[in-house]
């Protein structure tokens, strides 16, 4: 019986010691005075105190409240970890800000480099600014080159001067095969080709009418067709007609004459065909 009572007593004593151990492991709640002193020591440069320093700090802070040596050790360890986290967070924020600034700096530099390039392209290819003047020049060139463009006095004179250099055949007393050049203004006098001395001469309308009326004194028998056939026997001499009813000189293009004469090898000689008739008419011509 006695050993059993001893075991119960020993078990009861163990339970009391366990309760004391549980009571001793309660959470430490530092007072404001203890926290202020610990922070002053930390700002003073103390980061990892040794065992002797921990005992001294514990003895000094025990006057302001309950504290143990392990509480002092863990406080310094946790405070260093919090400082490292704060420093790491600050470094991350600063690195993020620097990367953003670097990115925006390069983006703005690229945009600033693109703007002068676009300005240079607009100066090299002034499509919008020179569209009006370029369009005017193109319209002028097209009006000069296009055959359907309206005739101006300058272009009509240039066309008449160019036509003067082409080889043409003229029929003074026949009806005009083609209408005269279009007139742009009533003041502009049209130009006509006049056959004088075997060559075409450009004369105004009034002078051409005068010369054609003066040349009507000659008979048609004295004129020879372009292909060498005399027209005296076919058409008798006609009296002089008024200048107002006389037809203007018609200009036949070189291409049309070449197409009409394509079937002949060469013009016929009038002396071989009608030697006698021409000799009799030489007195009148002289």
Curated annotation (Swiss-Prot):
A GO MF label: DNA binding
DNA-binding region residue numbers: 23-87
Region (Disordered), start-end ranges: 1-25, 128-152
InterPro entries associated with the record: HD, Homeodomain-like_sf, WUSCHEL-like
Key word RNA-binding present: no
A Pfam family: Homeodomain
Gene Ontology terms: cellular component: nucleus
Any one of the GO BP annotations: plant organ development
Keywords: Developmental protein, DNA-binding, Homeobox, Nucleus, Transcription, Transcription regulation
Keyword Transcription regulation: yes
Subcellular location: Nucleus
Organism domain of life: Eukaryota
CDD domains registered for this protein in UniProt: homeodomain
Family classification: Belongs to the WUS homeobox family.
Function noted in UniProt: Transcription factor which may be involved in developmental processes.
Name the UniProt record assigns to this protein: Putative WUSCHEL-related homeobox 2
């Amino acid at each position: 019986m006695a050993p059993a009572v001893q075991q119960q007593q020993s078990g009861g004593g163990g339970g009391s010691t366990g309760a004391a151990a549980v009571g001793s492991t309660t959470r430490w709640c530092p007072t404001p005075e203890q926290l202020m002193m610990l922070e002053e020591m930390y700002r003073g440069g103390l980061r990892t105190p040794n065992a002797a320093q921990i005992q001294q700090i514990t003895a000094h802070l025990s006057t302001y409240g309950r504290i143990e040596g392990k509480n002092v050790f863990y406080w310094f360890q946790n405070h260093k970890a919090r400082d490292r986290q704060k420093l790491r967070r600050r470094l991350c924020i600063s690195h993020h800000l620097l990367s953003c600034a670097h990115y925006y700096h390069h983006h703005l530099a690229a945009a600033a480099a693109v703007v002068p390039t676009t300005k240079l392209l607009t100066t090299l290819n002034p499509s919008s600014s020179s569209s009006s003047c370029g369009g005017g020049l193109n319209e002028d060139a097209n009006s000069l080159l296009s055959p359907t463009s309206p005739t101006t006095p300058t272009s009509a004179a240039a066309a008449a001067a160019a036509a003067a250099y082409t080889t043409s055949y003229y029929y003074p007393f026949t009806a005009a095969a083609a209408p005269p050049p279009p007139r742009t203004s009533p003041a502009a006098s049209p130009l006509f080709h006049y056959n004088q001395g075997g060559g075409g001469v450009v004369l105004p309308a009034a002078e051409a009418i005068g010369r054609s009326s003066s040349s009507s004194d000659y008979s048609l028998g004295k004129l020879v067709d372009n292909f060498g056939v005399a027209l005296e026997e076919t058409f008798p001499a006609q009296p002089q007609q008024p200048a107002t009813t006389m037809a203007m000189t018609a200009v036949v293009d070189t291409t049309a004459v070449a197409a009409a004469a394509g079937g002949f090898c060469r013009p016929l000689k009038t002396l071989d065909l009608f030697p006698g008739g021409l000799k009799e008419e030489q007195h009148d011509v002289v």
